[in-house]
Regions:
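Intrinsically disordered, low-complexity regions
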Residues: 4, 99, 212-213
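Thiamine diphosphate
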Residues: 10-155, 160, 181-184, 198
């Protein structure tokens, strides 16, 4: 059973250093410590610093075994990550709230297909707005897409939720949204973070040919019921 207490009990047996980090920098470290292997997204405030941090750590040799990129757009990024997830790799998607509109076509089908390697969608909302066209609330989008959302109130919560989201995704074979807001993304506080990380290895079997990776109407009919059951199970686990 996945319990909410797991959000605050993530074991990390590495050499650690205390650093003053912006929220987005901390989210990057959290994902790397969780073993993320493929990171892709499209830039836009307040989300951009996450991928910039991952790329810098990779260039410095502190984030080993990963692929990180700015994609052509949000839809391309999510489709790339879907393929990586089907091999068992842990994947992280990043965008700002309006960017999720661009990825929505892939996202709606992806939830019906499901995932293998943990897939986390880091979608930064911008109440205000401070740097966006709209105040779009990703929680409404997630309800429409029938996806679980972890909604941190502080950078510390966000760090823990980012790590836990990968486990939640793999346990229930669903993408999971982590939804910080501008004040969380750009707040700074101290974190104990790993000096170096390694991406989690892809399972030996890698990608396996299976009809479930292709969503046709008959499969979609079955998957819709499975999604409803999955959400009920997640809600129950977080309620006990």
């Amino acid at each position: 059973m996945f319990h909410v207490k797991h959000l605050y009990a993530m074991g990390r047996a590495r050499t650690m250093t205390k650093k003053l980090l912006m929220g987005n920098e901390a989210f990057a470290h959290a994902a790397l410590e969780a073993g993320v292997r493929v990171v892709a997204g499209y830039p836009g405030t307040p989300s951009s610093e996450l991928i910039e941090t991952v790329a810098k750590l990779h260039d410095d040799g502190a984030a080993r075994g990963i692929h990180v990129e700015w994609s052509t757009n949000e839809k391309s990024a999510l489709e790339l990550l879907a393929g990586a997830s089907y091999t068992g790799a842990r994947c992280l998607f990043t965008c700002k709230q309006v960017g999720l509109n661009v990825a929505s076509d892939a996202l709606m089908s992806l939830n019906y297909v499901g995932v293998k390697g943990g897939m986390v969608l880091f979608v930064a909302d911008d109440p205000g707005p401070i740097s966006s066209q709209t105040e779009q609330d990703t929680r409404r989008f997630a309800s429409f897409a029938k996806l679980p959302v972890l909604d941190p109130a502080t950078p510390d919560q966000g760090f823990a939720m980012m790590q836990a989201a990968f486990d939640l995704s793999e346990r229930y074979h669903t993408p999971v949204i982590v939804r910080p807001t501008t004040r969380i993304n750009h707040a700074s506080t101290f974190f104990d973070v790993a000096d170096a990380t390694d991406a989690r290895p892809v399972p030996d079997e890698g990608f396996e040919r299976d009809p479930k990776w292709v969503i046709f109407p008959r499969r979609a009919y079955q998957a819709h019921g499975e999604i409803n059951e999955r959400l009920a199970a997640i809600a129950h686990d977080f309620a006990v």
